[in-house]
Each structure stands twice: as C-alpha cells, then as structure tokens.
Amino acid sequence: MNLNLSLEEVRKLSENYNVIPLYTELLVDTETPLSIFLKLKEKGQFNILLESAEGGEKWGRYSFIITGSSFYLRTRKDIGEIYERGKVNFFETKDPLSKIKEVVKKFIPYHDERLPRFWGGLVGYFAYDVVKFYEPVEDKNPDPIHTYDIYLVLTDVVVIHDNLTGKIKVVVPIFAQNGIEEEYERAKNLIRDTVKKLKERGTTFLNVVEKEPDFKNWRSNFTKEEFEDIVKKAKEYIAQGDVIQVVLSQRFRKRFKGNPDNIYRVLRFLNPSPYMYYLDFDQLKVIGSSPEILVRLEEGRIETRPIAGTRKRGRTEEEDKRLEEDLLSDEKERAEHLMLVDLARNDIGRVAKTGSVRVENFMRIERYSHVMHIVSDVVGELREGYDALDVLKATFPAGTVSGAPKVRAMQIIEELENERRGIYAGSVGYISFQGNMDMAIAIRTAVYRDRDIFVQAGAGIVADSVPEKEWEETVNKAKALMKAIEIAEESQEE
C-alpha cells in the first residue's frame, strides 16, 4: 500500500503542523460514492455522505464519504458535551459557537496540494434554534423530535471520490500531539482496514416502485385551518409595518417501516441538488437534497447565493427559455429576490472588509432537475480577526427561511409556529481543518429518529398572500421528499 508520507516525513512536518493528512490513492472506477458509503457504513458509528449535483444536472467533482470519529461536540439548549478519545465532558454555555472556535483554533494543518479544499475537519449540522443564543428570540416552543441543536463530528476516515477520474483518496488525519509513531500506525491501519472493506463487501440493488405520495399517511403539526390562521396573523404584522416578509412552516411526520439508507438512494435520482447529504448518526439520521447554500468561506472569500423566484422546468429548450423570460419579468419575484440580496449584503457586511461586499452575476437563471430559480452571488473578503464561526453567526439563519427584517420575522415565527424548528431551516456542512467552511440551508431535508420520519416546509408570507395558497405551497414543497420516502418504503433490496 502506497502512502503519501513516510513516518520520517510526518515527523519532520510535525515541527510546524499538528494535523497532517496521511492517505493512499486508488482507482475504483467501478464504484460510486453511494456504493462506497454503503460498503463502509457501520451500525453504531458516525457515517456521513456529502455529494453535489451542480445545477441539479451534473455531478460535482468530489464526493466525500466519512466514517468513524474519536471526537464529537453536541449541544442541546445550554448544555453541551464533548466526547474525546473515550471520555465525555459536559459543559454549560450561553455561547456554543465560542466553544467550537476553541476546538478549531487548535488545528494547525498541513495542506497537501494534491488534496481538494476539504479533506477533514468538523462535519454536521446547526439547528435553526441556535440563533436564539445570539438574537432576542424566545425559546418557548416544545421539541417533539428531541434533536441536538449542534452536532459536529471530527472526521476520522475521509474517502474523497473524484467523480471525474474515478479515483479515490482514503485520508486519515494524524494528530501530532497524540504521539507521532502511535498516530502514524493508527492512521495506516485505518486506511488499510478501509481499503479491505471496499474490496470485500458487496452492495444491494434497489427494485424501485414508482408512486406518488399518499397524503393520508402523513400527520401535520397544523390543521389546514390552523395554518391559514397563522398566515392571517402574519399578514396583520406585515400590515402594521413590523415585517416585509415572514416564512411560516409546517412539519409532517409518519412512521417509517423501511431502510432509511434507501431514502437517500431514491432522493439522489429523483431530485439531485447542489447540496446532497446523509448524516447517519445511528438513531438520528438527516437526509437532504438542498438547492441552497447558506454561506461558504474559502481562503478569506465569503460567498452566499440568495435564491428567490421559481418556475417549473419546461419540456423543451424553447419552453425553458420562455419560462426564464417570464420569471425575470415578474415584478413580485424580482422584488422578493432583491430583498434577499440586500439582506445577504447586510449579513456579510458584518464580517467583511469595508468596501469589499459586492453582488456578482446579478439575477441570473439557474436550472435544476424540476425547477428554475433566480440566483445572485453576494461576496466579500473576510475582515482581519474574524473566522468561519463569525461568518456563520453573521449569516445564520438564511433570510429565505426566516424573513425580513430577520430578527422581527424570527420573533413572529416563534410566536405563530407551535414547535421548535430543530434542524429544519438550520444548516448542514463542514468547517475544515484549514478554517474553510461550506454550509447548506437545511431545506428539502428529512429527519429520521426512532423509526419516525419528519419533513418540514415553509412559505414566504407577504402583504398579498392568500392563506390557502400558502398552505398549498408548503404541502407541494414537502411532496417531493414525501415521494422519495414512500418510494423507499415500498422498494425492495435485491
């Protein structure tokens, strides 16, 4: 087995760095990221798959399969716990992001130029309710799913699948402070075991049964009348001038009798998206196909991409072009998009160098598998003294899932919705050893816990919203995920 570094080379690098990637490279052109994930996943350990389909039409260059961890950090309300090398320490906090900062600041990584921008770090999610630590928003609603507010796993084994070449790199970080020889041996053994599993294990085929979702199988936390009532109340706040827009959501749940792995398998071909993820945290699983970035930080460049304005895809190229023109000439859609662009500029401006915030590719159309959207890029340069956690705090949660002005909209959401949002409308992604970050908005995302499956969807309420139409919008948004879940439940593994 060829490795990128010898023990002596690692020892030399450890004079300047305390996190050093050890890896081997293999040609596995008969495998897919999903088949690799299914071969490597183990019950009782952390298993994560991160993929991307650019524009929903072609797969991104790299997919990441992450297994195992000897460290995690998770919080629920003001109590947190850190698991490290077999020991659990509990802590109280009113500022959980500062605790994560402490962890990230310890890393001094060596970056091998042959590796992509992510090869390890913290991976997981931030629930929507984390914002209640940092903004004057109450936390009074019940939490029926009982998920953690923050759940981050430090990567152990990362398999980087290059979708262009068919090669993989099996990467394990060496933590110098734990002893160079011991860590080198540990990393080498993990790489060897991972390669062995890939060679020995088979995968199953899925006999897919196409069907439309049966809405009777699902139970919402609102009746239709109750949801229409909260839309009316939101419109009263809008009429009084409290907010311009507020995003209200409802949550659907059902008992799930199948294999949760198959939800991701079905979702992957039904609705490929820029951010696809499967976080398998044993009893808790987060399965998503999000079209929308929350924020990205890469080498000091901050980027977010407000998405607002939607049309269904046409059946032909000519119909697509007509629908694009119709979307770009819709004053209501343009106004909503402009509001979100302004919100993004303000958010990034809190942590960017003065004068560096700008809008690029303003109001272009991006096509996805089933819909097209108006998209703009808002970028800026990170101000001295700030890091990924500051950027997350400044931009969290997205305006597309809260409203504008953001703080007042969130206060109204807390008043009118009847349950904690949890993972919905939060973010899923990573903070790398180098301090880079890529976070998706947790929409079009299913949460599986103890054989129950939850799907949540929202609608942006504005002055001229029709309550029944807004209820229909939340149902229609949820249906794509419901369809994947019900197909997964009916399909047979072979």
UniProtKB/Swiss-Prot annotation:
Chorismate binds at residues 309-310, 424, 444, 458-460. Its EC number is 4.1.3.27. This is Anthranilate synthase component 1. It holds the Pfam family Anth_synt_I_N. It comes from the Bacteria. Binds 1 Mg(2+) ion per subunit. Mg(2+) binds at residues 336, 473. It catalyses: chorismate + L-glutamine = anthranilate + pyruvate + L-glutamate + H(+). Pathway: Amino-acid biosynthesis; L-tryptophan biosynthesis; L-tryptophan from chorismate: step 1/5. Part of a heterotetrameric complex that catalyzes the two-step biosynthesis of anthranilate, an intermediate in the biosynthesis of L-tryptophan. In the first step, the glutamine-binding beta subunit (TrpG) of anthranilate synthase (AS) provides the glutamine amidotransferase activity which generates ammonia as a substrate that, along with chorismate, is used in the second step, catalyzed by the large alpha subunit of AS (TrpE) to produce anthranilate. In the absence of TrpG, TrpE can synthesize anthranilate directly from chorismate and high concentrations of ammonia. GO terms for biological process: L-tryptophan biosynthetic process. The keyword Metal-binding applies. Keywords: Amino-acid biosynthesis, Aromatic amino acid biosynthesis, Lyase, Magnesium, Metal-binding, Tryptophan biosynthesis. L-tryptophan binds at residues 52, 274-276. Feedback inhibited by tryptophan. One of its GO terms (molecular function) is metal ion binding. It is an enzyme of class 4 (lyase). Heterotetramer consisting of two non-identical subunits: a beta subunit (TrpG) and a large alpha subunit (TrpE). Belongs to the anthranilate synthase component I family. Its cofactor is Mg(2+). The gene is trpE.
